[in-house]
Amino acid sequence: MQSYKYDKAIVPESKNGGSPALNNNPRKGGSKRVLLICLDLFCLFMAALPFLIIETSTIKPYRRGFYCNDESIKYPLKVSETINDAVLCAVGIVIAILRIITGEFYRIYYLKEKSRSTIQNPYVAALYKQVGCFLFGCAISQSFTDIAKVSIGRLRPHFLSVCDPDFSQINCSEGYIQNYRCRGEDSKVQEARKSFFSGHASFSMFTMLYLVLYLQARFTWRGARLLRPLLQFTLLMMAFYTGLSRVSDYKHHPSDVLAGFAQGALVACCIVFFVSDLFKTKTTLSLPAPAIRREILSPVDIMDRSNHHNMV
């Protein structure tokens, strides 16, 4: 007699003994999805909390003195800025988010790429991950910037023009002057103590470098070899010009801009390579192995087959 044994792929069981497909609880999955989204929003809020506290409160920067013969803080105050805060935020955020939306829709609609997210709609899931990572990086970058500004309190190039100290009450022969009184508007004086490091340089470098790395990961069309590098270098030149304009506007020292570039680039690289999945290798799910029939022979069958081969 011959008997057959089937080896079947083992399906992992859930806690109550059944397969995952049979134990899929929609209500439990929905509550877990909401919990994860709330956790992400909480993390985003905590990342932006230092920035929000410093910008909306009366926290004053460190009060630093000066030298009377310091030429680096004697520049005039320019009323107009080459790139103001509104333009910086609008261009940096809008361009990046629009490009991310376009890239993710193309990836899902035309390339038919799937997502393992708990969010069922693939478009919403992709935008949630990529835009969420970008906004998280913006919050981290701005929090770093504001912490440095209030902690160091470096004087801007136009500090003396804004402060307008009474030099008749100051003895410049003492060298470093710490006891002085500013006759200028207090809000402008406090802002003139936030030179290091440049927020425009750090924000523009973060947004543009993040978009450069996003294009490197998502722009896979090989039709025009120089199109992607052209777009990437254009974005970097926009960030570079933004930082340099702060020097010509007498808002920052050159070292402030360089430090801002370095901080923005560092945060962008950390977010792209350690937080997002842009450059992570995608693993494919392997299908269960088919059932394999193995023939089990009894001792009598083995002897019969042996005799048959000997006769042949």
UniProtKB/Swiss-Prot annotation:
The keyword Hydrolase applies. Glycans are attached at residue 171. It is a multi-pass membrane protein. Magnesium-independent phospholipid phosphatase of the plasma membrane that catalyzes the dephosphorylation of a variety of glycerolipid and sphingolipid phosphate esters including phosphatidate/PA, lysophosphatidate/LPA, diacylglycerol pyrophosphate/DGPP, sphingosine 1-phosphate/S1P and ceramide 1-phosphate/C1P. Also acts on N-oleoyl ethanolamine phosphate/N-(9Z-octadecenoyl)-ethanolamine phosphate, a potential physiological compound. It comes from Rattus norvegicus (Rat). It is an enzyme of class 3 (hydrolase). This is Phospholipid phosphatase 3. A motif (Integrin-binding motif) lies at residues 183-185.
